[in-house]
From Swiss-Prot:
It comes from Shigella flexneri. This is Protein TsgA. Signal peptide: none annotated. Its main location: membrane. It is found in: Cell inner membrane. It is a multi-pass membrane protein. Belongs to the major facilitator superfamily. TsgA family. InterPro entries: MFS (IPR011701), MFS_dom (IPR020846), MFS_trans_sf (IPR036259), MFS_TsgA (IPR023528), MFS_TsgA-like (IPR050375). Residues 32-50, 99-100, 155-161, 227-244, 294-296, 353-360 are periplasmic. The keyword Oxidoreductase does not apply. It comes from the Bacteria. The chain crosses the membrane at residues 11-31, 51-71, 78-98, 101-121, 134-154, 162-182, 206-226, 245-265, 273-293, 297-317, 332-352, 361-381. The keyword Transit peptide does not apply. The gene is tsgA. Residues 1-10, 72-77, 122-133, 183-205, 266-272, 318-331, 382-393 are cytoplasmic.
Amino acid sequence: MTNSNRIKLTWISFLSYALTGALVIVTGMVMGNIADYFNLPVSSMSNTFTFLNAGILISIFLNAWLMEIVPLKTQLRFGFLLMVLAVAGLMFSHSLALFSTAMFILGVVSGITMSIGTFLITQMYEGRQRGSRLLFTDSFFSMAGMIFPMIAAFLLARSIEWYWVYACIGLVYVAIFILTFGCEFPALGKRAPKTDAPVEKEKWGIGVLFLSVAALCYILGQLGFISWVPEYAKGLGMSLNDAGTLVSNFWMSYMVGMWAFSFILRFFDLQRILTVLAGLAAILMYVFNTGTPVHMAWSILALGFFSSAIYTTIITLGSQQTKVPSPKLVNFVLTCGTIGTMLTFVVTGTIVEHSGPQAALLTANGLYAVVFVMCFLLGFVSRHRQHNTLTSH
């Protein structure tokens, strides 16, 4: 593989995470405006975003097998066509059914693209370099989470319709589409090089179960938290801009944390530092949820920084539970995380409807505590140390 080709594939991976981050995180900013657009209460409107999350979940789950049937480049180019159709559907229709369909299509495109992006990184990089590359790739998720709420706040404050936010997000996929030209992708399945030796099948082990539960609870907790921070902040008397700033600050700190931890993680055992970070994140979220508005800005910055490496480290540890990284194993952990994404508004929408936004934030806090327990238990069964020892000889 040429260096320029590797760079293009790496940038496709970066942008695939930015696309998913933008679609998922901007929801909290535009939800109120979309609810007004369709004359629905916010708690009811939040349920329609389950179609976005369901699309992500289904596509990531199926793509573990589709990647071996449909070439990666073909998937990405077809995804561009679907993205154009979905954004056009949002812009030119006032039907709630079509809105839900467009959201589902956006989810499918996002899930396919992100699973391809994750696979490319695990395929091109090995060992500790894989972990730091995955962490840097995931930083584009939070970079989009920092940039697009600011774009949304800018557009909405000027009474520009909410669907233009999704048109802006579509530009990320335009860049991915352009990068596919003149770029060679790894061949899988029947198109894979015949010289490759057959890979011996390995049992995944109970560590994968702990990591999968941790991935689900972490994503459900994180998105359940950040999706309702704007409503919670507005309930405390903050303006829409100030609420948007809280979300942007979280993702800015998250992004900086990823860059920092992509260097720091090289010096620590991944399972041990993951347990410490999960415990710290649970404590900091509790401080935010029970603190005063004066301290919210600082606690959300600290939470963003110290929780930034958790999800990517879970994926990296998952890929290290077998001697040879398995696309199906990585996709399984990703799928569990995406189940958390899909359940976000199913779980939190009901909680907010009955008990208000703070109850959703406290539920997210409980889920972070579960992540800590799973990471602690992983220490007794993880295989990453023996596999790292084998690869270092």
